[in-house]
């Protein structure tokens, strides 16, 4: 990455993260002025994001859709573009930026990690057991995520209602 692209990219990430934070605070405390500031952070972040993609396009000579970083950054850019158009035309959807900005920060963070360029598998990994292992490991992570989500929901309801009802009888 060129210096201009790097500065623009990380400025966008920081602004999206600030936007996400303001969205969360605005939604939690039901303050539309805070949510409006979040939209401003998101819009400025979008300008920096556009600059980063433009510099990348100029530097490489092709649209930023080929490498992993480029394709994820472009997908995030389109997501923010869609959100900005939506919240401009339908202000009632302004708070949906909490999901957009949060996801975009995660995607851009993921895209900026070391190379995900695919290569040939080594002979020791060319086995049906790799597929079986990856399937079960991924399924286990999914189960842990579901369990964590149910646990958070259970704790939230228990602490705020003091009655769980029949649907939350959890075996322990």
Residue locations for each model-derived region?
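Polytopic transmembrane helical bundles with strong interfacial aromatic enrichment
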Residues: 1-172
